[in-house]
Amino acid sequence: FSKFQTNKKTSLSNVQNYIPIYDRFFSLNNTNYNSINLNHLWSLSDIKEKDGDKSENIFNCKLKNISDIEDFTMTQKVFFKMAPLLDPFKYIVGKYNHTDEHLFNLPSFDKSIRVHPKIEDTNNSSYIDGFFCFLTSQMLNSHSFIHGVDYYGSFLAIKNNYKVNIIDDLDYLITSE
């Protein structure tokens, strides 16, 4: 995942493997906490390029088959699902303290690093959503579940220039205090 740290195509920074929900499934320690991934069939090995101007989230990627001892790879269009750790609408209407210097800190295995409690919560909707994507991929690849989506891994990062479509929520934003 080190290639994602320097990839300017994604506009991501501070990319990390550690996700708090992993605390429920793995025995994490200071040496392994940032190298754990769920057991999925394909993983991202490289991001080649953004796929046109139609979407900020579709990339041509090199995928590696995890179970193949011959290191079989393929290139495919991949949708990157961006799931914010904090509700952007609550942020816009001022439900979060904008002056909190720890508001945008990513969670860490090192509990001395201060982060917003919602970001640290293993039940954060973004972590649950990512785990659900993993489970549907398992069903797709192991049980031919036709409504599953392929899962290539989860990472946490800061999305620079994050955009939110507020058109359907204008009434809420205008009337909220």
Which residue stretches match the model-derived regions?
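Conserved ATP-binding subdomain of kinase catalytic cores across diverse folds
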Residues: 37-38, 43-177
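Juxta-kinase regulatory segment immediately upstream of eukaryotic protein kinase catalytic domains
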Residues: 1-67
